[in-house]
């Protein structure tokens, strides 16, 4: 099936790329919900995540070393401008592997992927509709690679992340054997 065709070893098929986007969105939708829950509980609306929460792979650093580098990355994020972090995300110059929680599930059906892709924007709209009076600048999510982001910035990251993978799909499609 074309959806499952990966053009080379250690590359993703179009289906896997789409599934990764689904899983990534679900992770961040849960993070946004957690921030809204903090507000409802009267707590500070700040989530600080660590490498151990996501277990990503960055550069050529072993995954097992990343939890020990949380503080180092925090310091880098204090001085690295957001525009440069965005450039690194969009350019794919910094090699990363998907975190375990967003690693695609091979062999999913096209129907299942389509249904989940269609459900994502609705789920996100429902999340924000539940907080009509909220100041989204006041909800802060910290990620060791992305630094501190309010909800507007987090949504911009999700858009940029999707753009990267749309390009990946565009690169993959011509390589599919028909």
For each feature predicted by the language model, list its residue ranges.
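A short, structured beta-strand-centered segment in the mid-to-C-terminal lobe
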Residues: 113-116
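Residues forming anionic-ligand binding surfaces in small-molecule and nucleic-acid pockets
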Residues: 99
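Short, contiguous alpha-helical
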Residues: 4-55, 72-96, 118-178
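Basic helix-extension-helix modules of the SAP/HeH family
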Residues: 58-64
């Amino acid at each position: 099936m074309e959806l499952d065709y990966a053009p080379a070893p250690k590359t993703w098929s179009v289906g896997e790329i789409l599934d990764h986007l689904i899983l990534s969105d679900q992770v961040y939708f849960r993070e946004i919900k957690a921030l809204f829950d903090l507000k409802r509980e009267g707590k500070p609306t700040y989530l600080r995540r660590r490498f151990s929460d996501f277990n990503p792979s960055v550069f050529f650093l072993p995954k097992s070393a990343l939890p020990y580098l949380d503080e180092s990355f925090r310091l880098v994020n204090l001085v690295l401008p957001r525009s440069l972090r965005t450039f690194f995300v969009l350019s794919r110059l910094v090699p990363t592997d998907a975190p375990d929680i967003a690693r695609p599930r091979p062999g999913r059906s096209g129907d299942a992927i389509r249904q989940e892709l269609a459900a994502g924007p609705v789920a996100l709209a429902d999340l924000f509709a539940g907080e009509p009076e909220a100041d989204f600048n006041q909800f802060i999510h910290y990620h060791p690679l992305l630094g501190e982001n309010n909800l507007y910035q987090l949504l911009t990251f999700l858009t940029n992340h999707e753009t990267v993978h749309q390009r990946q799909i565009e690169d993959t499609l011509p390589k599919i054997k028909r």
